[in-house]
Amino acid sequence: MATITASSSASLVARASLVHNSRVGVSSSPILGLPSMTKRSKVTCSIENKPSTTETTTTTNKSMGASLLAAAAAATISNPAMALVDERMSTEGTGLPFGLSNNLLGWILFGVFGLIWALYFVYASGLEEDEESGLSL
């Protein structure tokens, strides 16, 4: 059995939401009652071109070589990932072509393709070829 109780905390929350706290850079939005950020009209972008020195180049090359060495060591030491395949997982990640876990599914796929091809062949052979048909070169 569910009961509903009323308390005065709801009115406190309502009163707290009506209190207006003005913050620097924030103006109140009269539409939704939500604060909106004030817009600053000036945006300054700058770029500096620092000449590369040989010290930074050698440091970059050393760090690149160290990271490549660490990646190669991790790749050679780690074992290949083996998947635990359960019947509930079907054929995901097992490497079977087209995800066919049963030979009957392959024959069904081949039969549907053959049926569609045969129906198209019968349909196309009944078309009359004239200059405007687009079937002849």
Curated annotation (Swiss-Prot):
| Location (main, coarse) | plastid
One Pfam family here: PsbW
Keywords annotated in UniProt: Chloroplast, Membrane, Photosynthesis, Photosystem II, Plastid, Thylakoid, Transit peptide, Transmembrane, Transmembrane helix
User: What is the membrane topology listed in the Swiss-Prot or TrEMBL record?
Assistant: Single-pass membrane protein
InterPro entries assigned to the protein according to its UniProt record, in alphabetical order: PSII_PsbW_class2
Topological domains, Stromal: 124-137
Its cellular-component GO annotations read: chloroplast thylakoid membrane; photosystem II
Q: What interactions and quaternary structure are annotated?
A: Part of the photosystem II complex. PSII is composed of 1 copy each of membrane proteins PsbA, PsbB, PsbC, PsbD, numerous small proteins, at least 3 peripheral proteins of the oxygen-evolving complex and a large number of cofactors. It forms dimeric complexes.
State the similarity comment: Belongs to the psbW family.
Q: What is this protein called?
A: Photosystem II reaction center W protein, chloroplastic
| Species the sequence originates in | Spinacia oleracea (Spinach)
Lineage of producing organism: Eukaryota, Viridiplantae, Streptophyta, Embryophyta, Tracheophyta
**This protein's encoding gene:** psbW
